[in-house]
């Protein structure tokens, strides 16, 4: 767990204790809806830096342009910023606002990449595409994905021929298979694990949910060493 998430978890814990103390309510954040329009409105308009995972300036523009109505948008934002994917950010925003212009090379890519508007963001997507095109097992596809992300050229040279042959057996020409391989090497290098992005996204959403519905308690939870003292409430 990185520093930002540790800080956020501490804030969330303090906030929940304050809510329990003041209102007698036990809030289970694991069960809150993740499609709350009021929460997304705050995410889009909030200019504060107290949600620490979003305090860095590089999050400001992606937050405004990506995080609109679904938790997957927040996941994408964290993935893009975490790996500094500027070109993918531009492509994601453009495709998100005009999905009719997305062009998929195959049904395989449309099936895997539709939820990220045709942009390869996650290791899990990379593994799925390798497996679906070539028939290489998921386990080995995951190993190839690792080689791609780490730029391990000797290992990739060994697996290129296996991928190309397998893809040809699934109905693609040698030229098409080689083009797909090169595309995977380029686009797959900056992918991130979805579970990491999902965890960061849900933590971010939880903070904004608390900030939306319990703003005083959330504010008080930000105060260092507050110890849940009512004198800090500002109520």
Residue ranges and their predicted role:
Residues 1-235:
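Noncatalytic, beta-rich nucleic-acid-contacting surfaces in large DNA/RNA-processing enzymes
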